[in-house]
Amino acid sequence: GCDYSAEIHSTGRHSLRARVVACHLLENESPLRIHLGIPLAKGQRMDYAIQKAVELGVEKITPLRTERSVVKLDSKRLEGKREHWHQVIIAACEQCGRARVPALEPLQALPEWSQAARFGIVLDPEDANSLRELQPPATDVHLVAGPEGGLTGREVAMLRAAGFHGVRLGRRILRTETAPVAALAAMQLLWGDF
């Protein structure tokens, strides 16, 4: 991505004309290519998780439908939410100085999303493994945390069958919006650019 310098030539009530005078290549993207799956969450939780994930360098974000997803959206409300989340992503990019806007993928069911993963991590408070015990990923990473109420045993088993590594983030159970942020920060520290 680039930042551009421009000279303003004219302004109107609802317009502006400018000429680009320089392109400044930004090299602030994470070496980790993380695709975050976020189960639909109520209130501001989804916004918070998306905002912080962008600040922490994710490449793609996919809203997920899980068995315990509390939020149910019809197609009209979903489109409005997608537009809102895209604006959250853009604002987070502006705040943290990213020139590349992470992709916001369409809503998917968890099983469908997990099939595209070559290296996956499922945050599971029941698991005994930590991120430190995993080898640094040589490919894109799919990361998923549970919704309010957590992933079901069937969902965790399905993810493991798809090759996902189960990871516990300490001894405490984290909220649905906190868990991905904590995991992303730890991943950047272990394998990324922190």
Predicted regions and their residues:
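Active-site/ligand-binding-proximal alpha/beta "capping" segment
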Residues: 120-157, 164-168
